[in-house]
Structures are given as structure tokens and as C-alpha cells.
């Protein structure tokens, strides 16, 4: 089947093209007409650099992995979904027989096929065929745009869960880009206050719209240190989420953490990053790392439906599919949230 798709040909070059899909509807699959696709930081990384760490774009690849749409066909074994249902899709398809999947950590399955992670094509196209087990019905009060945001929110949920947040904890989020959505998950997880820092005031203005968030421009490191001291009585934050992937930040990640605190590494540096091990040892910092999520979509959808996760301020613009190239060019500007 030939359809229109947004294809990354190589670093810096994308175009809408006729694309051949070889997907076949299986008994346990659904076919989905794509309605809304978000632009993630990883999409922009691939667009700009053609790689993230070991994941290298060696041949043309369809972009996009944050999506929602409408079911247009369902396999004979699918009982919980039907044609016409509004849905969002978890973009990773693991081997359900792998040791990791059987242990409930299917996000770590080495054989997982994840949309828009080389060499797997993404979902910025007219339709997809996807396992029904990784397709989730949207409540009536959750829009298509919110449905597309479930994917990055799920990363926040995974991060907040692994951080082991306790009621009343103080959190610090470094990096106010799309993945900085984690701040909402930290608040929902029990943090009484969350400091969020970035070097772009435009991003911080978005963060300021959320109650309980304290936005600080980290160009002024003294201002950041003062805010941490003010909220923690000089102890340091209980949990820190590193969402920037910036090597200088990772090197000094222990500076603002309380003794015995936790650092969650969420952002992905393009290249290996140094870390001050001794500084971390001196505080016995616990490090947690995040690779996507597992079993977080149902929880995230419930929180969206309840109104406890508000993504409206994070939706900066909406583009028609025919304007996808322009949308990516805009998203590649350093101050944009999409």
C-alpha cells in the first residue's frame, strides 16, 4: 500500500513522499488512521544529527512516534477495541516471549521495535497497523492532541515512579523542553514543590503556568542555587530529573542534590558524557536511568482524563500534515515546544 509519509532522508533533509507500506493486518492487530502526531526531542535530534548514540539513520526513515487516531479495521481476535474508536498507541513493540517482557520490563527488550528509532519507520503517515495490545482507547474527554501527548507523559510517569518520590519531596528538573513534562508527573507523584531550570526564558514562561513549579534561568547559576537553598533549607533537593542531556550538566549533577538523594537520568546525550563520581559518592546519590516506559499508558490516560495532568500550555502550535516540514523546522528552533 502506497501512502504519504514524512521521511527523513538524511540529517537535515526531510520531505513528504510516497511511501510503500508492507504492513498486513493480523488477527491481533488494528489498523489506525492517523489523526495527530507530536514532535519529540528525539525526532528533532534525528532530523538535525541523523543519530542518537548508537541509533544511526543509515537509510531513509519515516519520523514520528507520538500519535493518536481512529481505528478503521480490527483483527478477528481483537475484543476490547472496535472500528471508530479513538485511540493512542504505545510506539514500542517488544517480543512478548523475551525474558524482559515476561519480567514486565518490556521496554528493555533488546528486540523491541520502536517507531522512528532506526531502522524502524515511524507513524507520521496516513495509517498504521499496530498490535491491539499496545493500542489504548481514549476517554471522551481526552482530545486527539492530548492522546498524542500520552507518550512523553508516560516517560514522566516512568521517571517519577522510578524516582521513588515521597509526599513532600522537593524536586529539581533540569531542561524545560518537551521531556520536561516530567515536572507534572513529579507533582502528581507527591512533590510539594518542583524547581525547573533552563537557559531559555521562552520555555520557562510555559513552566510558570503550572502551580507548584518554580522556574529559574540556569544561565544564572547563583539564582538556581539560591532557589534550591530557599526551598530546601540548604539541604538540597530530594530528587533531581536530568532532562537536558547536556554533558556539562551531567558532569555536575550532584551539586544541588541532598545527601541520600536520587538523580534520574532522562535526557539522552548525543555522545558519552562524563560524571563526577566522587561528588556523587560523597552524598551517596542514588542514580536511576530511564529508557522509555512500561505499563504506563493506562495510568497516564487516567490522569489526563481526571484533569490532574494539564498539557494545554505545552501545545505551542498545530500544523496540517502538508506543512510537516515547516513544523519540524520550527521544532528545531531551540526555544520551541511542540
Swiss-Prot record:
Pfam families: ADH_N, ADH_zinc_N. It catalyses: xylitol + NAD(+) = D-xylulose + NADH + H(+). InterPro entries: ADH-like_C, ADH-like_N, ADH_Zn_CS, GroES-like_sf, NAD(P)-bd_dom_sf, PKS_ER, SDH-like. The keyword Oxidoreductase applies. It is an enzyme of class 1 (oxidoreductase). Binds 1 zinc ion per subunit. Its EC number is 1.1.1.9. It comes from the Bacteria. Homotetramer. This is D-xylulose reductase. It comes from Morganella morganii (Proteus morganii).
Amino acid at each position: 500500500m502506497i501512502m504519504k509519509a514524512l521521511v527523513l532522508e538524511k540529517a537535515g533533509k526531510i520531505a513528504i513522499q510516497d511511501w510503500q507500506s508492507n504492513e498486513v493486518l493480523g488477527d491481533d492487530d488494528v489498523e489506525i488512521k492517523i489523526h495527530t502526531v507530536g514532535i519529540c526531542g528525539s525526532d528533532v535530534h534525528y532530523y538535525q544529527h541523523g543519530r542518537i548514540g548508537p541509533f544511526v539513520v543509515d537509510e531513509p526513515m519515516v519520523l514520528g512516534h507520538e500519535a493518536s487516531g481512529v481505528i478503521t479495521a480490527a483483527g478477528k481476535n481483537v475484543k476490547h477495541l472496535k472500528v471508530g474508536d479513538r485511540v493512542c498507541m504505545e510506539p514500542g513493540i517488544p517480543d512478548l516471549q523475551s525474558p524482559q517482557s515476561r519480567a514486565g520490563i518490556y521496554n528493555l527488550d533488546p528486540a523491541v521495535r520502536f517507531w522512528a528509532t532506526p531502522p524502524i519507520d515511524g507513524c507520521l503517515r496516513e495509517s498504521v497497523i499496530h498490535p491491539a495490545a499496545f493500542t489504548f482507547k481514549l476517554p471522551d474527554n481526552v482530545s486527539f492532541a492530548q492522546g498524542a501527548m500520552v507518550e512523553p507523559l508516560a516517560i514522566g510517569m516512568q521517571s517519577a515512579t522510578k524516582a521513588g518520590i515521597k509526599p513532600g519531596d522537593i524536586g529539581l528538573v533540569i531542561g524545560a523542553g518537551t521531556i520536561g513534562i516530567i515536572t507534572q508527573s513529579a507533582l502528581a507523584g507527591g512533590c510539594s514543590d518542583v524547581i525547573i531550570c533552563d537557559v531559555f526564558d521562552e520555555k520557562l514562561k510555559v513552566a510558570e503556568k503550572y502551580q507548584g513549579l518554580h522556574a529559574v534561568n540556569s544561565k544564572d547559576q547563583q539564582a538556581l542555587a539560591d532557589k534550591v537553598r530557599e526551598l530546601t533549607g540548604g539541604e538540597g533537593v530530594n530528587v533531581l530529573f536530568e532532562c537536558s542531556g547536556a554533558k556539562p550538566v551531567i558532569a555536575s549533577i550532584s551539586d544541588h542534590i541532598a545527601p541520600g538523594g536520587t538523580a534520574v537520568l532522562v535526557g539522552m546525550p548525543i555522545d558519552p558524557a562524563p560524571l563526577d563520581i566522587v561528588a556523587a559518592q560523597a552524598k551517596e546519590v542514588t542514580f536511576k536511568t530511564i529508557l522509555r516506559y512500561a505499563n504506563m499508558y493506562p495510568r497516564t490516560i487516567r490522569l489526563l482524563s481526571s484533569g490532574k495532568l494539564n498539557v494545554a500550555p505545552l501545545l505551542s502550535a498545530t500544523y496540517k500534515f502538508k506543512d510537516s516540514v515547516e513544523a519540524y523546522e520550527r521544532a528545531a528552533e531551540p526555544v520551541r515546544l511542540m
